[in-house]
Regions:
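Alpha-helical transmembrane bundles and membrane-interface segments of multipass inner-membrane proteins
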Residues: 1-155
């Protein structure tokens, strides 16, 4: 069963990597492609900093910081895999690790992260941000770890 979580983390990494490769084929200045319903669109963006454009121009520091965080996630992932039950936490760390590895790989290999999902909502700040699948994996993983820990602490 432990191997299943490892395979899922690697599968999430591969899925995001494959989507990013497809997105990279889009012309640089191409218009945003609205998805059905108009709530989100696809447009390629190279992010040379962190979320929200912070720390731009400091990729070496971002890579070191991201590497340390990813190593910590990997350590927690390995630790939680040794525990009985805790399926929600295991799944959460699986998503966290798959997403973190994909974004770290981009930063190390290309010097930027490829983002491509932009929302169209009533919230201006959300509309300014651009995401990739790994970002959603990381968010989902964090929620699952939190829920799993909450459930485990109530026992």
């Amino acid at each position: 069963m432990k191997l299943l979580y490892v395979q899922l983390a690697l599968g999430l990494f591969q899925l995001d990597h494959a989507v990013k490769q497809e997105i990279e084929q889009l012309p640089e200045q191409e218009e945003e492609h609205l998805l059905p319903g108009g709530l989100a669109g696809i447009k390629r963006l190279h992010k040379y900093g962190t979320a929200g454009g912070h720390a731009r121009g400091h990729m070496d520091k971002i890579i070191r910081w991201s590497g340390c965080v990813t190593a910590g996630i990997a350590a927690m992932f390995a630790w939680v895999l040794t525990k009985p039950d805790r399926k929600m936490e295991k799944t959460g760390y699986t998503f966290l690790l798959g997403g973190a590895l994909s974004n770290l790989y981009d930063r190390c290999r290309k010097g930027y992260v490829t983002d491509y999902i932009r929302f169209h909502s009533p919230w201006k700040r959300l509309n300014e941000l651009v995401f990739n699948l790994s970002d959603f994996f990381i968010m989902a993983g964090a929620v699952l770890v939190w829920l799993g820990r909450e459930g485990h602490s109530r026992r």
